[in-house]
């Protein structure tokens, strides 16, 4: 491999076979972080993250990973937390500028594009690439649910469902087993909790906590944090379901 | 001269997706003498251990008021910390100018995080080699915010940073359930006991090397005078010392001139 040959020390350097290693390494920061799953269902989008709580001294909901960009669009950041926070702040600022200029909320496609452009500039070599990615999600009657992921490379794709972080492969395999188009948001919340729990590594993933956000018909198209009692109920459902599956085996 | 190829600059990712320069800056914070912050429902307290270069010099200031409703304490490179304290003072006063009211602590924490993050990403800067604790009181109640050079900024019930701070955090984790309903006086005692656990057995807290800052409901931030500090230290001296904890996590090196 080309690691250590000097072609991987700056984002401004191509390796002889045309790769930009610094961007790949930044992606690693996302790959090694806690799992995050986002799923678009029948009438909304749900995002769920597995967060490491390293001490009981943290206050409840310290370091949230999910935020509003505006009333209708939510963002969930994965990877290096401070980098993700800076991305959220940029997205929020762009949405605010749009609102001032056009007197209407910034559409999700424009938000995702503008953040992707911002991230991309950081892959050209003046500074280091962002070690974080961001899901953007929205729902309304006209377009239905929409879900985007912007990666540290600046790539920006729309998804039906996707997973990033440590256990993304296992999580994606689990998502593919579901008929997500047929599930409403309340079912998605449960299944998402189940998937996060089933892909956990029992020996390594300790002191973890689930954080969830949703947008859909039942929230009237507003992006919101999922209330803690709903999260707790989803976790209880998931535990029961996992026990049941164990019995079958 | 470098430990590996990827630690020469903050703008370089290692193949594992880590930022070594930022991690080293966190080490600078860990060399500074400790500071502890805890909160109850109504009050937030920060205490700090000050070092003096020698017997003739004064102790280096570690606690700053940043507004009537908030103060900070510092561990690490104190000159970096002073810059951050000044930055927060400016944030507080410009918010007051814009909104005619005190800045919410959450907003202060967010702007702090963005400032710290920029220093981990852009060429020509280095991360701040300092961690700070913000103690504040606003309409949402009392707050303790912890920051570090990697731009992790987090709200805590209680915490400690700096040399041998693990011992203090152990004390805090054991007693965290009592903080919520504590009186301001009890809160200060808890904080001082935690701070004392960071000291080696032959050293002790005294009015000269200890700073206490407190803020809360209907009481603006105040940095206690030496005489008041002595009163609180008296209450602490009746508690027996837990030995062993501090020695286990001894920090490398002695008192570096810059890091106090």
Swiss-Prot record, chain B:
Places the protein is found: Cytoplasm; Nucleus
SUPFAM superfamilies tied to this protein: N-terminal nucleophile aminohydrolases (Ntn hydrolases)
Annotated GO biological process: proteasome-mediated ubiquitin-dependent protein catabolic process
Residues annotated as signal peptide: none
Major location category of this protein: cytoplasm
Spans annotated as Disordered: 240-260
SMART domains for this protein: Proteasome_A_N
Cellular component aspect of the GO annotation: cytoplasm; nucleus; proteasome core complex, alpha-subunit complex
The UniProt record lists the keyword Cytoplasm: yes
Family note: Belongs to the peptidase T1A family.
Subunit structure: The 26S proteasome consists of a 20S proteasome core and two 19S regulatory subunits. The 20S proteasome core is composed of 28 subunits that are arranged in four stacked rings, resulting in a barrel-shaped structure. The two end rings are each formed by seven alpha subunits, and the two central rings are each formed by seven beta subunits. The catalytic chamber with the active sites is on the inside of the barrel.
Designated name of the protein: Proteasome subunit alpha type-1
Biological source species: Caenorhabditis elegans
Gene for this chain: pas-6
């Amino acid at each position: 491999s080309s690691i250590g040959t000097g072609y991987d020390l700056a984002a401004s350097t191509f390796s002889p076979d045309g790769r930009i290693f610094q961007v790949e390494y930044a992606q690693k920061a996302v790959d090694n972080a806690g799992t995050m799953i986002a799923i678009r269902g029948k009438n909304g989008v749900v995002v769920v993250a597995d967060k490491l709580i390293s001490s009981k001294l943290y206050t409840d909901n310290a370091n949230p990973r999910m935020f509003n960009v505006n009333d209708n669009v939510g963002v969930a950041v994965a990877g290096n937390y401070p980098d993700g926070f800076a991305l959220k702040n940029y997205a929020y600022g762009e949405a605010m500028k749009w609102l001032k200029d056009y007197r209407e909320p910034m559409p999700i496609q424009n938000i995702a594009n503008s953040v992707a452009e911002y991230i991309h500039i950081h892959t050209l070599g003046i500074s280091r690439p962002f070690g974080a990615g961001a899901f953007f999600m929205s729902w309304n009657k006209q377009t239905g649910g929409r879900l985007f992921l912007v990666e540290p490379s600046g790539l920006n794709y729309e998804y039906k469902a996707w997973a990033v972080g440590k256990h993304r492969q296992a999580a994606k395999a689990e998502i593919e087993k579901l008929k997500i188009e047929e599930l409403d948001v309340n079912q998605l919340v449960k299944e998402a909790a189940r998937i996060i729990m089933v892909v956990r590594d029992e020996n390594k993933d300790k002191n973890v906590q689930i954080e969830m956000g949703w947008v859909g018909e039942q929230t009237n198209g507003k992006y919101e944090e999922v209330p803690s009692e709903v999260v707790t109920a989803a976790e209880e459902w998931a535990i029961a379901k996992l026990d049941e599956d164990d019995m079958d085996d | 001269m470098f430990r590996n190829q990827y630690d020469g600059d903050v703008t370089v990712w290692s193949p594992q997706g880590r930022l070594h320069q930022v991690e080293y800056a966190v080490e600078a914070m860990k060399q500074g003498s400790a500071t502890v912050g805890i909160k109850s429902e109504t009050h937030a307290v920060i205490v700090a251990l000050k070092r003096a270069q020698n017997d003739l010099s004064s102790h280096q200031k570690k606690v700053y008021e940043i507004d009537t409703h908030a103060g900070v304490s510092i561990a690490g490179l104190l000159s970096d910390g002073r810059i951050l304290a000044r930055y927060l003072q400016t944030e507080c006063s410009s918010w007051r100018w814009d909104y005619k009211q005190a800045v919410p602590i959450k907003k202060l924490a967010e702007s702090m995080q963005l400032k710290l993050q920029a220093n981990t990403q852009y060429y020509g800067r280095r991360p701040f080699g300092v961690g700070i604790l913000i103690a504040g009181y606003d309409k949402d109640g009392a707050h303790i915010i912890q920051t570090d050079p990697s731009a992790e900024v987090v709200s805590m019930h209680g915490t400690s940073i700096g040399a041998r701070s693990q011992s203090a955090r152990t004390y805090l984790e054991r007693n965290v359930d009592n903080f919520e309903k504590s009186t301001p006086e009890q809160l200060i005692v808890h904080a001082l006991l935690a701070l004392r656990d960071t000291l080696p057995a032959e050293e002790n807290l005294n009015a000269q090397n200890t700073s206490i800052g407190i803020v809360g409901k209907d009481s603006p931030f105040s940095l206690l005078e030496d005489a008041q500090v002595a009163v609180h230290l008296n209450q602490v001296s009746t508690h027996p010392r837990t030995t062993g904890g501090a020695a286990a996590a001894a920090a490398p090196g002695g008192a570096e001139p810059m890091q106090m």
